[in-house]
Amino acid sequence: MDLRVLNPDSEGIGEVAARGKTVMSHYLDDPELTAETIVDGWLLTGDLGRFDSSGHLQLFGRKKNMIVTDGGKNIYPEDIETVFDGLPVKEYCVFAANYIWPAKALGDEMLLLLLRLDQGQEFDEALKQEVVARNRRLPDFKRVGGCVIWDKDFPRTAAMKVKRVALAEEIRKTLSRAAIVEL
């Protein structure tokens, strides 16, 4: 199998593409999706990555999850989420506020940490301070500006990945921007 990184940015990160005898050639009865996914014989995986100096592929996240800041920097929610690993909550994930609640005037994008607390747990001052302390480990442009408390389990795929689109839609229908607890 051959792999390459398409349209790399200044840090060498781009979309991973694959081709080979074991890579799919098309979607059955879906020429439009095939045309979007297979380009010049290369399968566009939707994963973002780069090759390191040893030739190993490093993955950074999914293209559809990437957030572009006002300053033009690319942020991968998965990168930010690793800083919050071990946070004493049931589950969490990072979103751009404007992705959940589209704003008419873009600018000053706020990143949010969506928290699913354990049963009976509250977002108290101790938990807030732990979030703030972990947040300080991130460069300024990657810091979350607030938290949103969510009372339902996150929808997941069979592979246990968060269904971000479905979760954002559910939040949009249920909560407003007023639910953001600023840090």
Pin down the residues of each PLM region.
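Short secondary-structure edge/capping micro-motifs at helix/strand boundaries
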Residues: 33-34
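Thr-Gly-centered strand-to-loop micro-motif
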Residues: 5-6, 18-19, 38-40, 44-46, ...
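Conserved beta-loop-beta connector loops within the AMP-binding
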Residues: 1-19, 50-54, 102
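AMP-binding/adenylate-forming catalytic core of the ANL superfamily
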Residues: 20, 25-26, 48-140
